[in-house]
Amino acid sequence: MPFKGLVVQVADPQTLDKIIDKTLDTVGKSREQIFEISEQSRNEYVSLEQELQEVRMKVAEIIDQSDRAEVHARFARNRLAEVSKQFHRYSNEEIRKVYEQANELQVKLALLQQEEQQLRDRRDAIERRLLNLKDTIERAEELVGQMTVVYNFLTGDLRQVGEALEDAREKQAFGLQIIQAQEEERRKLSREIHDGPAQMMANVLLRSELVERIYHDKGIDEALKEIRDLRKMVKSSLAEVRRIIYDLRRMALDDLGLIPTLKKYVKTFEEHTGIFVDFKHIGKGERFPEHVEIALFRLVQEALQNTRKHAKASHVHVKIEEQKTKFTVVIKDNGKGFDQTEKKEGSFGLVGMKERVNMLKGQLVIRTKPNDGTTIIISIPITTEE
Protein backbone atom coordinates (compact mmCIF):
# COMPACT_ATOMS: atom_id res chain seq x y z
CA MET A 1 0.00 0.00 0.00
CA PRO A 2 1.62 3.30 -1.04
CA PHE A 3 2.46 5.89 1.60
CA LYS A 4 0.61 9.08 0.77
CA GLY A 5 2.23 12.37 1.57
CA LEU A 6 5.75 10.88 1.85
CA VAL A 7 8.29 13.43 0.58
CA VAL A 8 11.87 12.49 -0.24
CA GLN A 9 14.25 15.44 -0.11
CA VAL A 10 17.25 15.35 -2.42
CA ALA A 11 20.25 17.51 -1.65
CA ASP A 12 20.97 20.18 -4.25
CA PRO A 13 24.25 20.08 -6.24
CA GLN A 14 25.73 22.99 -4.24
CA THR A 15 25.32 21.07 -0.99
CA LEU A 16 26.94 17.98 -2.50
CA ASP A 17 29.82 20.12 -3.78
CA LYS A 18 30.36 21.49 -0.27
CA ILE A 19 30.48 17.96 1.11
CA ILE A 20 32.95 16.95 -1.59
CA ASP A 21 35.09 20.06 -0.89
CA LYS A 22 35.21 19.21 2.80
CA THR A 23 36.13 15.62 2.00
CA LEU A 24 38.81 16.81 -0.43
CA ASP A 25 40.32 19.05 2.23
CA THR A 26 40.49 16.17 4.71
CA VAL A 27 41.92 13.74 2.13
CA GLY A 28 44.45 16.33 0.96
CA LYS A 29 45.70 17.08 4.48
CA SER A 30 45.92 13.38 5.32
CA ARG A 31 47.84 12.73 2.12
CA GLU A 32 50.33 15.49 2.97
CA GLN A 33 50.82 14.11 6.48
CA ILE A 34 51.50 10.63 5.15
CA PHE A 35 53.87 12.08 2.54
CA GLU A 36 55.78 13.91 5.31
CA ILE A 37 56.07 10.64 7.24
CA SER A 38 57.38 8.98 4.08
CA GLU A 39 59.96 11.73 3.51
CA GLN A 40 61.11 11.71 7.14
CA SER A 41 61.46 7.93 7.01
CA ARG A 42 63.35 8.15 3.72
CA ASN A 43 65.77 10.76 5.13
CA GLU A 44 66.34 8.64 8.23
CA TYR A 45 66.86 5.61 5.97
CA VAL A 46 69.61 7.40 4.01
CA SER A 47 71.27 8.60 7.23
CA LEU A 48 71.18 5.13 8.77
CA GLU A 49 72.55 3.56 5.59
CA GLN A 50 75.55 5.89 5.87
CA GLU A 51 75.99 5.05 9.56
CA LEU A 52 75.70 1.34 8.76
CA GLN A 53 78.46 1.67 6.18
CA GLU A 54 80.70 3.35 8.76
CA VAL A 55 79.88 0.77 11.46
CA ARG A 56 80.68 -2.08 9.07
CA MET A 57 84.04 -0.49 8.29
CA LYS A 58 84.75 -0.09 12.01
CA VAL A 59 83.79 -3.72 12.66
CA ALA A 60 86.23 -4.84 9.97
CA GLU A 61 88.97 -2.66 11.50
CA ILE A 62 88.27 -3.91 15.03
CA ILE A 63 88.31 -7.54 13.87
CA ASP A 64 91.70 -6.94 12.26
CA GLN A 65 93.01 -5.29 15.43
CA SER A 66 91.57 -8.08 17.59
CA ASP A 67 93.24 -10.74 15.47
CA ARG A 68 96.61 -9.02 15.84
CA ALA A 69 96.03 -8.43 19.56
CA GLU A 70 95.13 -12.10 20.00
CA VAL A 71 98.44 -13.13 18.43
CA HIS A 72 100.41 -10.75 20.67
CA ALA A 73 98.48 -11.81 23.79
CA ARG A 74 99.05 -15.49 23.04
CA PHE A 75 102.76 -14.86 22.55
CA ALA A 76 102.89 -12.93 25.85
CA ARG A 77 101.07 -15.74 27.70
CA ASN A 78 103.47 -18.31 26.31
CA ARG A 79 106.37 -16.09 27.34
CA LEU A 80 104.92 -15.74 30.85
CA ALA A 81 104.45 -19.50 31.14
CA GLU A 82 108.05 -20.04 30.09
CA VAL A 83 109.35 -17.51 32.63
CA SER A 84 107.17 -19.01 35.37
CA LYS A 85 108.63 -22.47 34.77
CA GLN A 86 112.18 -21.18 34.92
CA PHE A 87 111.70 -18.22 37.26
CA HIS A 88 115.07 -18.90 38.93
CA ARG A 89 116.79 -17.82 35.70
CA TYR A 90 115.14 -14.39 35.71
CA SER A 91 115.27 -11.46 38.03
CA ASN A 92 112.19 -10.17 39.84
CA GLU A 93 112.19 -7.11 37.57
CA GLU A 94 112.19 -9.24 34.42
CA ILE A 95 109.38 -11.44 35.75
CA ARG A 96 107.34 -8.34 36.67
CA LYS A 97 107.77 -6.84 33.19
CA VAL A 98 106.73 -10.07 31.47
CA TYR A 99 103.68 -10.37 33.72
CA GLU A 100 102.67 -6.73 33.20
CA GLN A 101 103.08 -7.03 29.44
CA ALA A 102 100.92 -10.18 29.30
CA ASN A 103 98.28 -8.57 31.51
CA GLU A 104 98.29 -5.34 29.47
CA LEU A 105 97.86 -7.22 26.19
CA GLN A 106 95.08 -9.36 27.66
CA VAL A 107 93.23 -6.24 28.86
CA LYS A 108 93.67 -4.63 25.44
CA LEU A 109 92.29 -7.75 23.76
CA ALA A 110 89.28 -7.80 26.10
CA LEU A 111 88.54 -4.13 25.38
CA LEU A 112 88.76 -4.72 21.63
CA GLN A 113 86.43 -7.71 21.88
CA GLN A 114 84.00 -5.65 23.95
CA GLU A 115 84.09 -2.82 21.39
CA GLU A 116 83.59 -5.33 18.57
CA GLN A 117 80.51 -6.75 20.29
CA GLN A 118 79.09 -3.25 20.82
CA LEU A 119 79.62 -2.41 17.16
CA ARG A 120 78.01 -5.69 16.08
CA ASP A 121 75.00 -4.94 18.30
CA ARG A 122 74.74 -1.44 16.80
CA ARG A 123 75.03 -2.87 13.29
CA ASP A 124 72.23 -5.37 13.95
CA ALA A 125 70.04 -2.65 15.45
CA ILE A 126 70.55 -0.40 12.41
CA GLU A 127 69.73 -3.25 10.02
CA ARG A 128 66.50 -3.97 11.92
CA ARG A 129 65.59 -0.29 11.89
CA LEU A 130 66.27 -0.09 8.15
CA LEU A 131 63.89 -2.99 7.52
CA ASN A 132 61.17 -1.26 9.55
CA LEU A 133 61.77 2.04 7.75
CA LYS A 134 61.61 0.34 4.37
CA ASP A 135 58.27 -1.18 5.31
CA THR A 136 57.02 2.22 6.53
CA ILE A 137 58.12 3.93 3.31
CA GLU A 138 56.45 1.31 1.11
CA ARG A 139 53.20 1.44 3.09
CA ALA A 140 53.21 5.24 3.09
CA GLU A 141 53.77 5.36 -0.67
CA GLU A 142 50.93 2.91 -1.19
CA LEU A 143 48.60 4.98 1.00
CA VAL A 144 49.58 8.20 -0.77
CA GLY A 145 48.86 6.51 -4.09
CA GLN A 146 45.46 5.30 -2.89
CA MET A 147 44.56 8.72 -1.52
CA THR A 148 45.67 10.32 -4.77
CA VAL A 149 43.29 8.02 -6.64
CA VAL A 150 40.45 9.13 -4.34
CA TYR A 151 41.46 12.80 -4.52
CA ASN A 152 41.74 12.84 -8.30
CA PHE A 153 38.47 11.02 -8.65
CA LEU A 154 36.60 13.36 -6.30
CA THR A 155 37.82 16.36 -8.28
CA GLY A 156 36.62 14.72 -11.50
CA ASP A 157 33.31 13.37 -12.70
CA LEU A 158 31.66 13.15 -9.28
CA ARG A 159 31.02 16.91 -9.43
CA GLN A 160 28.69 16.38 -12.36
CA VAL A 161 25.93 15.13 -10.08
CA GLY A 162 23.16 16.30 -12.37
CA GLU A 163 23.81 13.65 -15.03
CA ALA A 164 21.87 10.44 -15.34
CA LEU A 165 22.74 7.81 -12.71
CA GLU A 166 23.71 5.08 -15.16
CA ASP A 167 25.93 7.43 -17.13
CA ALA A 168 27.58 8.55 -13.90
CA ARG A 169 28.24 4.98 -12.85
CA GLU A 170 29.87 4.19 -16.17
CA LYS A 171 32.04 7.28 -15.99
CA GLN A 172 32.92 6.50 -12.40
CA ALA A 173 34.07 2.98 -13.21
CA PHE A 174 35.99 4.03 -16.30
CA GLY A 175 37.55 7.08 -14.66
CA LEU A 176 38.63 5.08 -11.63
CA GLN A 177 40.29 2.47 -13.84
CA ILE A 178 42.23 5.18 -15.68
CA ILE A 179 43.33 6.88 -12.47
CA GLN A 180 44.35 3.56 -10.91
CA ALA A 181 46.34 2.68 -14.02
CA GLN A 182 48.07 6.06 -13.92
CA GLU A 183 48.94 5.68 -10.25
CA GLU A 184 50.22 2.15 -10.85
CA GLU A 185 52.49 3.46 -13.62
CA ARG A 186 53.72 6.21 -11.30
CA ARG A 187 54.42 3.71 -8.51
CA LYS A 188 56.24 1.46 -10.94
CA LEU A 189 58.35 4.37 -12.21
CA SER A 190 59.01 5.47 -8.63
CA ARG A 191 60.21 1.96 -7.72
CA GLU A 192 62.46 1.79 -10.79
CA ILE A 193 64.03 5.16 -9.96
CA HIS A 194 64.37 4.34 -6.25
CA ASP A 195 65.84 0.86 -6.78
CA GLY A 196 68.00 1.98 -9.73
CA PRO A 197 69.58 5.44 -10.11
CA ALA A 198 68.45 6.80 -6.73
CA GLN A 199 70.04 3.86 -4.90
CA MET A 200 73.18 4.14 -7.03
CA MET A 201 73.51 7.89 -6.36
CA ALA A 202 72.99 7.32 -2.63
CA ASN A 203 75.85 4.81 -2.72
CA VAL A 204 77.98 7.29 -4.67
CA LEU A 205 77.30 9.91 -1.99
CA LEU A 206 78.21 7.51 0.81
CA ARG A 207 81.40 6.31 -0.86
CA SER A 208 82.46 9.82 -1.90
CA GLU A 209 82.50 10.79 1.77
CA LEU A 210 84.90 7.91 2.41
CA VAL A 211 87.45 9.01 -0.20
CA GLU A 212 89.05 11.61 2.07
CA ARG A 213 89.33 9.12 4.91
CA ILE A 214 90.83 6.50 2.60
CA TYR A 215 93.33 9.09 1.35
CA HIS A 216 94.50 9.85 4.91
CA ASP A 217 94.45 6.24 6.10
CA LYS A 218 95.69 4.30 3.06
CA GLY A 219 97.28 6.82 0.72
CA ILE A 220 96.62 8.33 -2.68
CA ASP A 221 96.67 5.04 -4.64
CA GLU A 222 93.74 3.58 -2.69
CA ALA A 223 91.89 6.90 -2.90
CA LEU A 224 92.33 7.02 -6.69
CA LYS A 225 91.07 3.44 -6.92
CA GLU A 226 87.96 4.43 -4.98
CA ILE A 227 87.43 7.42 -7.30
CA ARG A 228 87.66 5.13 -10.34
CA ASP A 229 85.02 2.86 -8.79
CA LEU A 230 82.83 5.90 -8.15
CA ARG A 231 83.18 6.92 -11.79
CA LYS A 232 81.94 3.48 -12.86
CA MET A 233 78.95 3.77 -10.52
CA VAL A 234 78.05 7.19 -11.93
CA LYS A 235 78.25 5.79 -15.49
CA SER A 236 76.00 2.88 -14.51
CA SER A 237 73.53 5.27 -12.90
CA LEU A 238 73.48 7.45 -16.02
CA ALA A 239 72.88 4.39 -18.21
CA GLU A 240 70.00 3.31 -15.95
CA VAL A 241 68.42 6.78 -16.16
CA ARG A 242 68.69 6.70 -19.94
CA ARG A 243 67.10 3.23 -19.99
CA ILE A 244 64.15 4.42 -17.89
CA ILE A 245 63.65 7.45 -20.14
CA TYR A 246 63.94 5.22 -23.19
CA ASP A 247 61.34 2.79 -21.85
CA LEU A 248 58.89 5.63 -21.18
CA ARG A 249 58.79 6.63 -24.84
CA ARG A 250 56.78 4.91 -27.54
CA MET A 251 59.62 5.86 -29.90
CA ALA A 252 58.44 6.16 -33.52
CA LEU A 253 55.44 3.88 -33.10
CA ASP A 254 53.02 6.40 -34.57
CA ASP A 255 55.23 7.05 -37.60
CA LEU A 256 56.88 3.71 -38.33
CA GLY A 257 54.30 1.22 -37.14
CA LEU A 258 54.60 -1.72 -34.78
CA ILE A 259 57.10 -4.03 -36.51
CA PRO A 260 59.77 -1.42 -37.48
CA THR A 261 59.52 0.11 -34.00
CA LEU A 262 59.96 -3.27 -32.33
CA LYS A 263 62.97 -4.04 -34.52
CA LYS A 264 64.52 -0.73 -33.48
CA TYR A 265 63.76 -1.39 -29.83
CA VAL A 266 65.20 -4.92 -29.99
CA LYS A 267 68.42 -3.59 -31.50
CA THR A 268 68.78 -1.01 -28.74
CA PHE A 269 67.94 -3.65 -26.12
CA GLU A 270 70.74 -5.88 -27.43
CA GLU A 271 73.23 -2.99 -27.33
CA HIS A 272 72.31 -2.03 -23.77
CA THR A 273 72.11 -5.52 -22.25
CA GLY A 274 74.36 -7.79 -24.32
CA ILE A 275 71.45 -10.26 -24.59
CA PHE A 276 71.00 -11.64 -28.12
CA VAL A 277 67.44 -11.32 -29.45
CA ASP A 278 66.28 -13.35 -32.46
CA PHE A 279 63.36 -11.30 -33.81
CA LYS A 280 61.04 -12.91 -36.36
CA HIS A 281 57.93 -11.45 -37.99
CA ILE A 282 55.42 -13.37 -40.08
CA GLY A 283 52.85 -11.29 -41.94
CA LYS A 284 52.41 -8.21 -44.11
CA GLY A 285 53.29 -5.65 -41.46
CA GLU A 286 50.04 -3.74 -41.85
CA ARG A 287 48.95 -0.93 -39.53
CA PHE A 288 46.43 -1.75 -36.83
CA PRO A 289 44.40 0.28 -34.33
CA GLU A 290 46.66 2.46 -32.20
CA HIS A 291 45.67 0.88 -28.89
CA VAL A 292 46.50 -2.60 -30.26
CA GLU A 293 49.94 -1.51 -31.52
CA ILE A 294 50.73 0.26 -28.25
CA ALA A 295 49.65 -2.76 -26.20
CA LEU A 296 51.72 -5.21 -28.26
CA PHE A 297 54.77 -2.95 -28.10
CA ARG A 298 54.46 -2.61 -24.31
CA LEU A 299 53.94 -6.36 -23.88
CA VAL A 300 57.12 -7.22 -25.78
CA GLN A 301 58.96 -4.44 -23.94
CA GLU A 302 57.83 -5.68 -20.52
CA ALA A 303 58.70 -9.29 -21.38
CA LEU A 304 62.23 -8.32 -22.46
CA GLN A 305 62.75 -6.17 -19.37
CA ASN A 306 61.63 -9.06 -17.14
CA THR A 307 64.17 -11.24 -18.95
CA ARG A 308 66.88 -8.65 -18.36
CA LYS A 309 66.10 -8.25 -14.66
CA HIS A 310 65.28 -11.78 -13.55
CA ALA A 311 65.96 -14.54 -16.09
CA LYS A 312 69.77 -14.35 -16.43
CA ALA A 313 69.31 -15.32 -20.06
CA SER A 314 71.78 -14.93 -22.93
CA HIS A 315 69.33 -15.52 -25.81
CA VAL A 316 65.71 -14.51 -26.39
CA HIS A 317 63.49 -15.48 -29.33
CA VAL A 318 60.68 -13.08 -30.22
CA LYS A 319 58.16 -14.13 -32.87
CA ILE A 320 55.19 -12.06 -34.00
CA GLU A 321 52.71 -13.65 -36.36
CA GLU A 322 49.82 -11.85 -38.05
CA GLN A 323 46.91 -14.18 -38.72
CA LYS A 324 43.47 -13.44 -40.14
CA THR A 325 41.78 -12.92 -36.82
CA LYS A 326 44.55 -12.47 -34.29
CA PHE A 327 48.09 -11.50 -33.43
CA THR A 328 50.27 -14.19 -31.85
CA VAL A 329 53.39 -13.16 -29.93
CA VAL A 330 55.88 -15.69 -28.57
CA ILE A 331 58.78 -14.62 -26.32
CA LYS A 332 61.11 -17.46 -25.31
CA ASP A 333 64.36 -17.17 -23.32
CA ASN A 334 67.05 -19.60 -22.20
CA GLY A 335 67.14 -18.22 -18.66
CA LYS A 336 66.75 -19.82 -15.26
CA GLY A 337 62.95 -20.03 -15.35
CA PHE A 338 60.87 -20.07 -12.17
CA ASP A 339 58.23 -21.93 -10.20
CA GLN A 340 54.86 -20.39 -11.04
CA THR A 341 53.41 -21.47 -7.70
CA GLU A 342 55.85 -19.22 -5.86
CA LYS A 343 55.56 -15.45 -5.66
CA LYS A 344 58.64 -14.00 -7.32
CA GLU A 345 60.20 -10.54 -7.51
CA GLY A 346 59.27 -10.16 -11.17
CA SER A 347 55.63 -11.22 -10.71
CA PHE A 348 54.47 -7.59 -10.77
CA GLY A 349 55.51 -7.26 -14.41
CA LEU A 350 53.70 -10.47 -15.34
CA VAL A 351 50.55 -9.31 -13.58
CA GLY A 352 50.67 -6.06 -15.54
CA MET A 353 51.05 -8.00 -18.79
CA LYS A 354 48.06 -10.20 -17.95
CA GLU A 355 45.93 -7.16 -17.18
CA ARG A 356 46.91 -5.49 -20.46
CA VAL A 357 46.07 -8.66 -22.42
CA ASN A 358 42.72 -9.01 -20.63
CA MET A 359 41.81 -5.44 -21.57
CA LEU A 360 42.19 -6.46 -25.24
CA LYS A 361 40.19 -9.65 -24.66
CA GLY A 362 43.26 -11.72 -25.45
CA GLN A 363 45.00 -14.67 -23.85
CA LEU A 364 48.39 -14.99 -22.15
CA VAL A 365 50.05 -18.33 -21.40
CA ILE A 366 53.29 -18.76 -19.45
CA ARG A 367 55.30 -21.98 -19.70
CA THR A 368 58.24 -22.23 -17.37
CA LYS A 369 59.95 -24.27 -14.69
CA PRO A 370 63.19 -23.82 -12.77
CA ASN A 371 66.37 -24.08 -14.88
CA ASP A 372 64.41 -24.55 -18.11
CA GLY A 373 63.79 -21.04 -19.43
CA THR A 374 60.49 -19.24 -19.90
CA THR A 375 58.07 -19.07 -22.82
CA ILE A 376 55.31 -16.44 -22.97
CA ILE A 377 52.56 -16.87 -25.58
CA ILE A 378 50.23 -13.93 -26.20
CA SER A 379 47.19 -13.98 -28.47
CA ILE A 380 45.38 -10.70 -29.29
CA PRO A 381 42.28 -10.48 -31.53
CA ILE A 382 42.96 -8.19 -34.51
CA THR A 383 39.30 -7.18 -34.57
CA THR A 384 39.54 -5.65 -31.08
CA GLU A 385 37.95 -2.22 -31.00
CA GLU A 386 38.78 0.67 -28.72
UniProtKB/Swiss-Prot annotation:
Chief location of this protein within or outside the cell: cytoplasm
Single GO cellular component term: cytoplasm
InterPro entries: DegS, HATPase_C_sf, His_kinase_dom, Sensor_HK_TwoCompSys, Sig_transdc_His_kin_sub3_dim/P, Sig_transdc_His_kinase_DegS
EC annotation from Swiss-Prot or TrEMBL: 2.7.13.3, 3.1.3.-
Annotated protein name in UniProt: Signal transduction histidine-protein kinase/phosphatase DegS
Gene that this polypeptide is encoded by: degS
CDD domains documented for this protein: HATPase_UhpB-NarQ-NarX-like
Pfam family for this entry, one: DegS
Known role: Member of the two-component regulatory system DegS/DegU, which plays an important role in the transition growth phase. Acts as both a protein kinase that undergoes autophosphorylation and subsequently transfers the phosphate to DegU, and a protein phosphatase that dephosphorylates phospho-DegU.
Subcellular location(s) per record: Cytoplasm
Post-translational modification: Autophosphorylated.
Gene Ontology terms for molecular function: ATP binding; phosphoprotein phosphatase activity; phosphorelay sensor kinase activity; protein dimerization activity
Organism: Brevibacillus brevis
Catalytic activity reported: ATP + protein L-histidine = ADP + protein N-phospho-L-histidine
